[in-house]
Amino acid sequence: MIRTTHFHYPSARDGCSIHALEWAPEGPPRGIVQLVHGISEHIGRYDETARFLAEHGFLVCGGDHLGHGRTVTDGSYGFFAPENGWTLAARDVRALRKLEGAHHPKLPYFLLGHSMGSFLTRTYLILWPGTVSGAVLMGTGQEPAPLVALGKRISALECRRLGPRGVSPLVHTLSLGAYNRRFRPSRTPSDWLSRDPAEVDAFLADPLCQSRPTVSLFRDMMGGLQLIARRDQLARMDPSVPVCFLSGQEDPVGGMGRGVEQVVRMFQDAGCRDLPLHLYPGARHELFHEQNRREVWADLLDWLEDRLPPSGPLDGGTPNG
């Protein structure tokens, strides 16, 4: 029987704590998978995927970012921090990795980031190289540098006009709102997430997914996108760490396949070599909520199992520094 535990741990942002979930398998875990969720959602949406992995022997964990899910206690949805929000969010990912790693120091440890969570995972690989056994980047991409710079500038201007907790219809339309244009005529504003109408409706009905991100979060995320695109920063990664890419062929965040292929090339240029890419025809942004999610789970499980030590955890375990 899978055991699910809710807990909190201190955030890098003073005075805040992060709500987290852990899914423990029935027997001794073979490895750990830490989920890093996307924008305007929460870790509870990954329950089905986490249970699948736990059924196959993995301990799964993940936290609600600042301004997301049950981490929010003051109504500040979609808000990281007044300043340095991206770094704080990345440090919270790192804190959970250290916490879980301390409990299981010899287990292989994997990060799995979706969408904004994939950008945070890429940030993690730069800031703390060699401290995970592997990473999975799902729903990732890379917008052209001039577009990212423009987005950061507009968000910063709106931040000065509205304050860091303000919400700008202009910024939302230019960013997330643009994704649905590719799927006209659309049934809902979120058709770009999945081909499965029931999954789209579940997202729209989820009260923890209804807030719009603040202008400061967009500003911080644009800064994060600039960081993870810089050659000098990519060179800081440990090239021996395997990275798996999962993306829908119809995912606008991944540029309909082109953007995620660009990210693979960026990793190759940084010296990384173990970089399998799975592009799923017809699939949109949220692969774990897509019609072919069982296919995605199977590919993910195969990749994880192929990167486990042949006879259980290595004596030295995974670096916990």
Regions found by a protein language model. Give the residues of each.
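Conserved alpha/beta-hydrolase
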Residues: 50-76
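Alpha/beta-hydrolase active-site loop
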Residues: 81-102
